[in-house]
Amino acid sequence: PDGTIHAGRLINYNTACSLMAFSVIENDRYQSIIRKARASIANSQIDLGEKGKLDDPHDGGVGYNSKYDHSDMNNTLMAVEAMRMSEMALRGSEKSANRPVVDLDWKALEHFLASCQNLPQRSNNPNLSKNIQDRGGFIYHPGESKAGEVVDEKSKRVALRSYGSISYAGMMSFAYARVEKDDDRVRAVIDWLGSNYTLDENPGMGQEGLYYYYHLMAK
């Protein structure tokens, strides 16, 4: 009834996967399922703090829904990919012609992406790294990097390290958000990925997440 598609866990992730599958089936019988799933994903977009105000680094992203109360880059990528694919499916259906389509707040999404990209000048997230080797890359969510962190001994400031798979997720999210390729945020993540390009490991993570890294790189 609420549009989600899951078996009791990983609600947003599984809904997004299912929505993508329904979106590539050229059959109008699934239009209602697609619309309801889109609405559930749009309604799950994180808005902490004051509602309607981008006052938290997690605002604008999407999370597991059933597991954590914050957004992360993996779930966000799945959500935005599903929303764009289903948007195309609805546009190509005569049954959906001229009907309003529930959508994400794409500007809020850009706020979340800024909170996860190591470009501190673009966000007020205090955990972003100022180290040149991290510049432009992405972290898992505003408070965590799977590649770990560096703590300044004097200031005790935490800097979250960029890593490969999630930086590809960030680059793809910019594409789905239709951020221009010449935008400095896009250029920065492409530069980081180029500087850290390898097929031997998931940069910053070693062998962990290697096949996911390949999967996103191939896309």
Task: Indicate where each model-derived feature is located.
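An alpha-helical repeat/solenoid feature that recognizes helix-turn-helix modules
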Residues: 1-39, 43-219
